[in-house]
Amino acid sequence: MSEVEKKLEMFVTVYYSLNVTLALSINILLLFIMKTTKSSLLKDMQYYLFNTALFEIIVSLSTYFAQCRPVANKSTLAVFCHGPCKYFGKNTCFVTFAVVQCSVVAASFSILLSFYYRYRLLKVNFKKKHKHATTFIIFSFFPTVMLLFQLLTDSNFAIVEAETREMHPDYDYVNNALIGFSDSKSPAAIIAQSLISLGVYMSPLIAFHYRRKINKILSTNTGQRIPVAYCKQLINGLLIQTLIPFCVYIPPYSYFLYSQLSGHSNLYFEYLLNIFGSFTAFINPLLTFYFVLPYRRALCKKVFKYFPSISEEGTEITTFPTTVQFQRGHTASTKF
């Protein structure tokens, strides 16, 4: 094991511990605020925000449990797992790695689902619970298929280890569990990788598409069932939540695809891939608190009231009847 890898292992151990602590704390707080805050501004939007928070919890737990980094070889894909999963066997690490990949994409898709719901709510009446259930089932199909193809990909760990030791003899094989895919060019592996790539690269484009459609509806209709300013702020928050993974995850993921084709790998990028994938687990709930006004006010009223330095002005929970028609020029401004 090189000195650089030793330092990186120490860093990621500390990072994943902090990440899972922050992510669980903030997401559980968000779920508590969701449960105790009632506002007609949100309607059934809380189901979709709850869905995102749930996937972020899965992302934080699975990335901490695995602490994995993929290493591209010529014909195989190796995965070094430094997390607690290594104490439960290689098969446990293999399943956890598949869950990590799929949960990151599923969390991103859950934000797109919120975009879709907001668009449908403005376009047509979309409030029946069975319609929500149908939508969740349809959108869960993509991550589920991705997970199945990952689990069905050839995974002869002995073949993976033999090629990895040949190409990367200086890596740490003592303190990590080595798993991976023995044939990275097989149909199942290609399909799984294509689905992940599709989810990573297409999410921002889909988000921009629905943002444009929603803004078009808001600009062409002066009367809305919800305040225009609130809706625009919510949509901007969802867009930022979609773009953050795009900005931080695309560079290392693109290099990972390149390394699979070239057979060359960089130690730093290997670690960065899943570090950036887990980064949003505690960032997204913070953005939800900021951009979803009823939750921000509830947070200030129930939590920040214990901190004298934070003003309580404008923290009351305000709800709006759904039957009232709001004009753009009469949208109330809120102090924060």
From Swiss-Prot:
InterPro entries: 7TM_GPCR_serpentine_rcpt_Srd, Nematode_rcpt-like_delta. Pfam families: 7TM_GPCR_Srd (PF10317). It is a multi-pass membrane protein. Keywords: Membrane, Transmembrane, Transmembrane helix. GO terms for cellular component: membrane. It comes from the Eukaryota. It is found in: Membrane. Its main location: membrane. The chain crosses the membrane at residues 14-34, 48-68, 93-113, 133-153, 188-208, 237-257, 275-295. Belongs to the nematode receptor-like protein srd family. This is Serpentine receptor class delta-51. It comes from Caenorhabditis elegans. The lineage of its organism: Eukaryota, Metazoa, Ecdysozoa, Nematoda, Chromadorea. The gene is srd-51.
